[in-house]
Swiss-Prot record:
Its EC number is 2.7.7.27. This is Glucose-1-phosphate adenylyltransferase. Involved in the biosynthesis of ADP-glucose, a building block required for the elongation reactions to produce glycogen. Catalyzes the reaction between ATP and alpha-D-glucose 1-phosphate (G1P) to produce pyrophosphate and ADP-Glc. It is an enzyme of class 2 (transferase). It comes from Streptococcus uberis (strain ATCC BAA-854 / 0140J). It comes from the Bacteria. It catalyses: alpha-D-glucose 1-phosphate + ATP + H(+) = ADP-alpha-D-glucose + diphosphate. The lineage of its organism: Bacteria, Bacillati, Bacillota, Bacilli, Lactobacillales.
Amino acid sequence: MKNEMLALILAGGQGTRLGKLTQNIAKPAVQFGGRYRIIDFALSNCANSGIDNVGVITQYQPLVLNSHIGNGSSWGLEGINRGVTILQPFSATEGNKWFEGTSHAIYQNIDYIDSINPEYVLILSGDHIYKMDYEEMLQVHKDNMASLTVAVLDVPLKEASRFGIMNTDSNDRIVEFEEKPEHPKSTKASMGIYIFNWPRLRKMLVDSENGNIDMSDFGKNVIPAYLESGERVYTYNFNGYWKDVGTIESLWEANMEYIAENNPLDSRNRSWKIYSKNHIAPPNFISEHAEVTDSLVVDGCFVTGKVDHSILSANVHMKQGAEIKDSFIMSGAVIGEGAKINRAIIGEGAIIGNNVVIDGTDEIQVVGYNEVVGVSNEN
């Protein structure tokens, strides 16, 4: 049975720029917005776009990510002839081989892709915050009779040198690709989202492997090769909210934008829901001494302090006299009596001792996964 389009989510990144937050978990598994993990956005987009089969390619610290995704039922992706498949590096005849790049990860999973037998493959990154209708992108791909379509976002010219830039003609056909150009000619930045005709991509990957030609990365190798060979390569112009949360600053900023009154992500739009794995938690407890303003407090929280313009994820315990402002507190964290937290990200299960001050006025502060700050080990 042939499936029209298979989605492949690249979720093996370490996310080194997130520092302590990714010491024990993969970047796509990092929490976001109080009740989500970053990969929930790509998975929810797939579900909302009517994609039945999704392969999630993992590598670095996959335990939390694998447990979170499970069989895909939280996104309605389980059932006959549909589902989510976790794809990890495996030992082949030549021995264990890590993925060497984005397109190499696809090549290593050719057997899985062939078992689905798609006409098209949709390549996604598992570490961006956005909503996109991939079915709409596929229609543009078909209308242009394209071999490859690249989703692009218009960025300010002063920021264009940070991205892979697509230079196009008047019909949105890509005529040149520049990787982080010093003097960009265009502001169309690649989002790392691609639709390929699978038979053509498959042939290129197999031929390059057999010929010992480096085709390990989509941006550095595959897209330039497509353009050089005269393939029909087009852009899909995306105009919605999109955030690369690859740094501490951008992750904090995205969470603060998420709780804005005019949320640019439009998270309250029920026609395009963001799904996640459900965890049963007791109701919140907000004491008579607590003061909560302009904040998101998720189930299971115990709040007896002051919270202003912040996110408290599930099961956060905030003791009396503590103050939290402009911060993102991940699930299971404990904030001690009289602690003061400003402009910070507090990791899952972290413990902040009594009267500890964490001030990110000059630079966003981070407390890592299960990290303990200001608590004596003597007891």
